[in-house]
Amino acid sequence: MAQARRPLMLIILDGWGYREVEEGNAVLSAGTPNLDRLVKDYPWCLLEASGGAVGLPEGMMGNSEDGHLNIGAGRIVYQNLTRINISIRNGDFFKNPVFLNAISKVKANDSSLHLIGLVSCGGVHSYTPHLHALIKLAKEKGLKKVYIHAFLDGRDVPPKTALGDIKKLNEFCKEHGGAKIATVSGRYYAMDRDKRWDRTKLAYDVLTLGASQYKAPNAETAVSEAYGRGETDEFVKPTVITDHEEKPVATIRDKDSVIFFNFRADRARQLTWAFVKDDFDGFVREKRPKIYFVCMARYDEDLDLPVAFPHEELKNVLGEVLSKQGLTQLRIAETEKYAHVTFFLNGGEEKRYEGEDRCLIPSPKIATYDLKPEMSAYKITDEVVRRIQSGKYDVIVLNFANMDMVGHTGIFEAAVKAVEAVDKCIGRIVEALKEIGGVALITADHGNAEQMIDSKTGEPHTAHTSNPVRCIYFGNGEVKALKKGKLCDLAPTLLELIGIPKPQEMTGKSLLVKE
């Protein structure tokens, strides 16, 4: 068995981007004595965490899913966004048998096609050109009853982007076959991932029953009125669009086909479960239509659903390599990022490797995380210090969600507090490692909190950034420096630190400079 330092830690500070401009920079504005000391006393480098470096289109901001996939894979992983874009360009998208089957069922049943998902150019969960391609495909195949159920972003893009996006979408629909927007819902409701079923139910009910607190004659009015209520895009209450008789334009009914065009799994699962699971118990479904439900990508490997772009298996990811060497590993995070240190870090696979323990700390049950910027970081730290001291683990992977999740709120003061809370936790963890000769790489998956104000508009900036991220080596003096690199270089670096040869599938390179 390879000789392991006990333990070697990978600490991922979600949303901890690197930016030298101080204005709107919660990272630089915060008091961070522990991180400052580490930067001063230990080797560090910058890593690319966006665009082509993580398998996304050039210039596109990074995100947590893609970041953790690249970290765990040790190679650039070409993301669903890129794969789908290529299929549209080469025409394969319009021949996709899963889409064609959904359309053929609509024709056979004289029913409706419903396109549900996030209307956003953010490229994190969805991408508007993919919706455009589906609308074009429906027109090409002669469908007359095509309805869009628009989830609004305001998180991966500025908080009041939806009105302009909806206007453009309506114009596109008029030019390409007349698809109609039937409902709008903020992603806070339609894309919850923390089992806050009361939110998911509101989205489900507007889709299946046309039942909602608000209604509007068109989607633009729905968004405008939501702004008037003080709601930004993410928080727009589910709203049904009605016809001249004030009846819903469309609801999802028996024999309809539904295409969920989000390509990222974590925030698509709950609503999908509500539609398709026989044993669903999140809430009482007043109506459960019998439909043909298509997922753009694989949302849940336990569900036998048609998937337009199936998962591409990654072999010899970090967790698998460690397990093959007989090493013990721990993955620890709070709810908001638990999937990232497990599912995504393991190459998009649900399976747990032999020797892999997992620790989930519940995220606080509050409306928005600016109300509790520390989130569950202190509880995570209590637990991980105990696990470090146990001597059980060779490798520990930890994620602190604070800088990303609080950064998404756009509340600068809260983001500063989030950074400071994480810094306190880093101080405790480093001390625990020092006592037993442990080693750590401290890094991030993408930026966020370093840019809380939009430099062009002066408005709050709630999205991720395309800035690089730091990687700090904490340990003994054998590592003299770190080379600039990409997120995919982290796994090879960890393997070198622990004395394991890099598998041929890992094309990333070690960051270590030892001479």
Curated annotation (Swiss-Prot):
Binding-site positions, Mn(2+) 2: D14, S64, D445, H446
Originating gene: gpmI1
CDD domains, alphabetized: iPGM
Function: Catalyzes the interconversion of 2-phosphoglycerate and 3-phosphoglycerate.
Lineage: Archaea, Methanobacteriati, Methanobacteriota, Stenosarchaea group, Methanomicrobia
Keyword annotations from UniProtKB, A to Z: Glycolysis, Isomerase, Manganese, Metal-binding
InterPro entries to which the protein is assigned, alphabetical: Alkaline_phosphatase_core_sf, BPG-indep_PGM_N, Metalloenzyme, PGAM_B_sf, Pgm_bpd_ind
Pathway as given in its UniProt record: Carbohydrate degradation; glycolysis; pyruvate from D-glyceraldehyde 3-phosphate: step 3/5
Listed transmembrane segments: none
Superkingdom per UniProt: Archaea
Residues reported to bind substrate: H125, R155, D156, R187, R193, R264, A265, D266, R267, K337
Disulfide feature: none
GO terms (BP aspect): carbohydrate metabolic process; glucose catabolic process; glycolytic process
Organism of derivation: Methanosarcina acetivorans (strain ATCC 35395 / DSM 2834 / JCM 12185 / C2A)
Protein name: 2,3-bisphosphoglycerate-independent phosphoglycerate mutase 1
Positions of Mn(2+) 1 binding: D404, H408, H464
Family statement drawn from the similarity comment of this UniProt entry: Belongs to the BPG-independent phosphoglycerate mutase family.
Active site: S64 (phosphoserine intermediate)
Broad EC category: isomerase
EC number, UniProt record: 5.4.2.12
Pfam families noted in UniProt: iPGM_N (PF06415), Metalloenzyme (PF01676)
NCBIfam families linked to this entry: pgm_bpd_ind
